[in-house]
A protein has these predicted regions:
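Short helix-capping segments at alpha-helix termini
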Residues: 26-27, 87, 112-116
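Beta-loop-alpha module in the N-terminal Rossmann-like domain of NAD(P)-dependent dehydrogenases
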Residues: 48-110
Length: 125
């Protein structure tokens, strides 16, 4: 069975929930976290026994990462999602996926062109 290696972009409260969820999946492994708040990212990386990346580009450049979870604040999902597509990474994005349809369309287009998957979180559903 393939083990999917995850990275989390964002180090706030929701990132900890995502890290716990990833840890509960048999064929998933959290390998890294990054965030603009480096102290929070370091704390989460220690808590979940994974690498702390300095930024999302460094994380996306890693061949070890298959999927990234975007757990940044609303309105800050498009850029890392498009960058992830450029690096061939699948994306699971916290809701709302973005704040305008135009921004969502750009994300969808980037992933269609890259042949990667883009999905949204629908917890408790």
């Amino acid at each position: 069975m393939k083990i999917w290696n995850f990275g989390i972009i964002g180090a706030g409260l929701i990132a900890d929930f995502h890290a716990k969820a990833i840890g509960s999946i048999n064929n998933a492994r959290l390998v890294g976290i990054c965030g603009t708040n480096h102290e929070k990212a370091l704390t989460l990386s220690k808590k979940h026994n994974c690498r702390k990346y300095d930024n999302h580009i460094e994380m996306l450049q890693s061949d070890e990462i298959d999927i990234v979870t975007i757990a940044t604040p609303s309105g800050a999902h498009m850029e890392p999602a498009i960058e992830a597509a450029k690096y061939g990474k699948h994306v699971i994005c916290e809701k709302p996926i973005e704040i305008t349809l135009e921004r969502i369309d750009k994300m969808i287009k980037a992933h269609q062109e890259a042949g990667t998957s883009l999905g949204g979180i629908f917890n408790f559903r």
